[in-house]
Curated annotation (Swiss-Prot):
Coiled coil: none annotated. The gene is CHRNB1. After binding acetylcholine, the AChR responds by an extensive change in conformation that affects all subunits and leads to opening of an ion-conducting channel across the plasma membrane. Gene3D superfamilies: Neurotransmitter-gated ion-channel ligand-binding domain. The keyword Cell division does not apply. It comes from Gallus gallus (Chicken). It is found in: Postsynaptic cell membrane; Cell membrane. It comes from the Eukaryota. This is Acetylcholine receptor subunit beta. One of its GO terms (molecular function) is transmembrane signaling receptor activity. GO terms for cellular component: postsynaptic membrane. Residues 1-15 form the signal peptide. Belongs to the ligand-gated ion channel (TC 1.A.9) family. Acetylcholine receptor (TC 1.A.9.1) subfamily. Beta-1/CHRNB1 sub-subfamily.
Amino acid sequence: APTVALLLLCALCSAADAPPPPPSAAASADGAYHAGVRPAPTPRDRVEVRVGLSLAQLVSLDEKNEELTTKVYLDLSWWDPRLQWDPHDYGGLGGLRVAASRLWLPDIGLDNNNDGEF
């Protein structure tokens, strides 16, 4: 029993010294982050989205039907001030990975697309 109490005490002391939990892109209890809201100070402000496209593979070229099939990597980047924090407040944590489904994402599409999928 004394060993269990000592281990429990050590665990509690470690938890007390731990930094606060890292910031999260998930909505907090007070609803501070909403993935459906554009990260702009006002509704009239623009969100600058930088777009990069890298060719990964040339799959096929059908000259008769004028179809080119490729595989590409799409790189989108923008600044969302709602997801910033001071790393010193979180034990030096400078970044974290969050599922894209939990973040605001720009509405990007390909206009000249043969099969309608992008």
